[in-house]
Amino acid sequence: GRTPIILLDIPGTVDGNILMYGHLDKQPEMEGWEEGLGPWTPVMKDDKLYGRGGADDGYALFASISSILALKEQGIDHPRVLVLIEFSEESGSPDLPHYMELCSEKIGTPDLVVCLDSGAGDYKRFWTTTSLRGLIGLTMKVEVLTEGVHSGGASGHVPSSFRIARKLLSS
């Protein structure tokens, strides 16, 4: 079996398509908790909640729905919003490509993707991340000739396949 996903489709009042992505799985429990605190029983202490995953983006589903409700309460129009919540992000999202393909027609082409998963510099204040770097894996093959030639005899006449690859990757 595959890990589950939650896919919410919230109709919009204006054109557009937003995809909000988050996860609900957590890192494995850790050792080294203070006395009276631990991974399995949530504890309120000094107006803070302590427990496993308390600061690991468990808010994704709540935050996405709350943001749409806040817009509705204020009478602010919003585009269609799809909320995709997965349960295998901490394991490298092995099932996410399957679900993205399975749901591709429903998801369509988002105008904006909001990632509900980021880091925090400390636990004393709220943090907002406005952009993330992406990652892509690919196999690239650049061919410039049908047969090999010595660089001393073709340098300057034959384009460098490495230079072409660098140009493609930097575009």
PLM regions and their residue ranges:
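Acidic/histidine-rich catalytic neighborhood of metal-dependent amide-processing enzymes
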Residues: 55-131
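Residue-level signal for secondary-structure boundary sites
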Residues: 16, 28, 91, 122, ...
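Midchain, well-structured core segments that form catalytic/ion-binding scaffolds
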Residues: 97, 105-171
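Acidic/His- and Gly-rich active-site-bordering loop/insert found
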Residues: 1-52, 71-78
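Fold-independent oxyanion-binding glycine-rich loops
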Residues: 22-24, 46, 87, 116-119, ...
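Short, conserved micro-motifs enriched in small and acidic residues
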Residues: 49-62, 90, 155, 159, ...
